[in-house]
Amino acid sequence: MFSGCRVIAVQYRLAPEHTFPAAHDDAEQGVMIIHRHAEQLGVDASRITLAGDSAGGHLALVTALRLKAAGTWQPAQLILIYPMLDATASMASYASNGEDYIITRDTLLSGYEMYLAATPATHPDASPLWREDFHGLPPVHILTAEFDPLRDRKS
């Protein structure tokens, strides 16, 4: 443990067996348990960072937004690695980078469709990119790649 950090991966239920909001609820419950039992886990509660890649990045952001809305606690920071933030697939990078790469537009959309089921893609927890309530979140670090269909961000 050279960094002095403890890494805890929260497991969450997956689609298609478990649809929206199962994964969101699991992520929120998981971080609440970690925060509540931080001392027992050898974790400094003031340094808890939420991080995730792809769907995990999505869950990290929405979990922080839920914690903020509930007025409980906020993580020290968020690290979102090529996060899935737009279930509407309306950004240009979905079209320009959505074919001929490992992760295609259709692959991303089928994942959203399985998870969201009857929930609209415009739901604030399904497409957090379009939300307006980011004020008050901790610092957010977003990592993405040039040819990633998830690259574009709202300006």
Q: What are the roles of these predicted feature ranges?
A:
Residues 1-153:
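Alpha/beta-hydrolase superfamily serine-hydrolase fold, recognizing
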